Amino acid sequence: TFREVLQINASHPLALLGMARAAEFDGEPSAKELAEQALAVNPNLVAAHVLIARLELEAENYEAAVRAAERALETNPSASGALAVLATVRYLADDRAAFEDIVRRALERNPRDTELYDGLAEMAVRNRRYAEAVEFARRAVALDSTSWRSHGILGINQLRIGEIEAGRESLERAFRGDPYDVWIKNTLDLLDTFERYREVPSQRFRFILYGEEADVLAAYLAPLAEEAYDRLAERYGYRPATPIRVEVFPSHADFSVRTVGLAGLGALGVSFGNVLAMDSPSARDRGTFNWGSTFWHELAHAFHLGMSDHRVPRWFTEGLAVLEERRARESWGSDVSPAFLAAYKQERLLPVSRLNDGFVRPAYPEQISFSYYQASLVCELIERDHGADALLRMLDGFRRGLGTPEVFRQVLGTDIEAFDRRFEAYMQERFGGPLAAIRPRTARDTTQAGPDDAVRLASREPDDFVAQLRAGRTLFNAGRRDEAVPFLERAKELFPEYAGPGSPYDLLARIWREKGDLRRAAAELQRMTALNENAYDENVALSEILEQLGDPAGAAAALERAVYIYPFEIELHERLAALYARTGEWEKAVREREVVLALDPVDRAEAFYQLALAHFEAGDAASARRAVLRALEIAPNFERAQELLLRLRSARGSTPEGGR
């Protein structure tokens, strides 16, 4: 292995290059440093210069990418990878004359140089230009019909733009020529599973849903999608072409294969433009992600990509998409965490001028999630100081080929370094209190201490959020609930935005519920569920409490939030149906009764009867009759179903001719 070689010779340039390539594949920030180490030993190592050029291009550092590519070409004027980087930069800058000149130079040296077009296609993908990737791959195939890699790149990108059958044909051709390509094999295996999926259409969407989950997910996803499209279209003054294809995978490994070809992708969803792919709620542990906000986020990308002609930088579209989540529903979208504020205080967050690096080449595991939230705050600040229209004008600037510094100057009237300083001030303004309450931790602070030690530390540090929360948690876990309350209240006062697991809201709600103080418990849970989009158990608990307090509408709203976290618990839908019956919202009750049936209840006769009753109360006698007959097919002696059928017949007999 490369590591074994480096143990013998720590300066072996090819081993360093191999490590750099592995790091590039894994998205690790060490890739560039390893390539530079290889060049320190051998400055003429063309492949290392090309690798650095690719990394700079991916980070949208175009001038640095050109310099690295030109260094490679000084040693080898025919280096296809370097020519591909130069051609990509010219292509992205809309300099078609220079682009075609580079392509001509490359093909004069090697008329069948598919590597050039393969490289162009792959770099188009890195810049989210999927349609262009298809065209470049087609050019490669036209040059050499036996370039199996080119056929594979073509097929993968045809799938990304929704050309499913054409993509399959290209991938099968690639596999016949090279049956050892793992990416191609995995993707073909995934396509074979599509026969188990159902296509569910709505007005502007085509949902590709796993058969067993289709009826449950479609009941919520279809109306959510149409609502999101309308709201985003109104905000952006733009309407993506329809139908938009949405693929929802019950296996995260399958989602990873669909998006990158290999299992292991950490994302929840991906937008290729008018094709979206995402995890089903069944692909993750309950309470770990919100599939409703994930869909809204990915659809927002479809608008941003379309408006900018797929030229929006990663940091800006991610920040805007998180902002759109927050606008969509209370609690949706990333929220501030103690770890984020600690990273800010430790100067581990990137300046806005380098924020893209946090997405494409993170330096530590949490940096991607921190960058999502930071980017949303940047967009929030821009909207506050320059108006919502400024965000639209920035998208237009990117569409016109401007880089981030130029967009800041032209649209916001500031250079990006000055904006960095404004963002620093905004962080203090927005989170001044919590920032002051996040203190540096020492080894002594983080050791497991007993309740009395935790209380002593918290008493000495009344303005330290972590010390207060630790004291409250430790006392809570020790069963000393009354003593825990003042520490939890103080922690909440110091950092009211924090609502993660084990937050003050969570523990206080449990304390008040145990004591029978349901109103105080409800108040804590209402605040927590307004901040935490993944709080499934807390929403269910809040619903139970609000129902006890005589608030069926509030109880139903809490369960609606829970549905977008995990919709596959049958008891949740039975409760929600009963709540909508109490509030007289019979169409929603019908939806819930249909979902109960989709989840295969033990007593299907009862489930059909309850559906029939909901249809009857909603005024749909025909659907009620069909459902009650299904109940009687299963249980012919079901008395309540028989009585309902008689009521339906009686109502039908008294309905004027032509009535429903």
PLM feature segments, named:
Residues 1-4, 24-37, 58-71, 92-105, ...:
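Structural signature of tandem alpha-helical TPR/SEL1-like repeats
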Residues 3-7, 37-40, 70-74, 104-108, ...:
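Conserved structural position within tetratricopeptide repeats
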Residues 7, 33, 40, 67-68, ...:
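Juxtacatalytic substrate-recognition/specificity segment
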Residues 10, 43, 77, 111, ...:
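Short coil turns that delineate tetratricopeptide repeat
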Residues 13-14, 46-47, 80-81, 114-115, ...:
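Helix-start (N-cap) detector for alpha-helical repeat units in TPR-like alpha-solenoids
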Residues 352-470:
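Pan-zinc metallopeptidase signature
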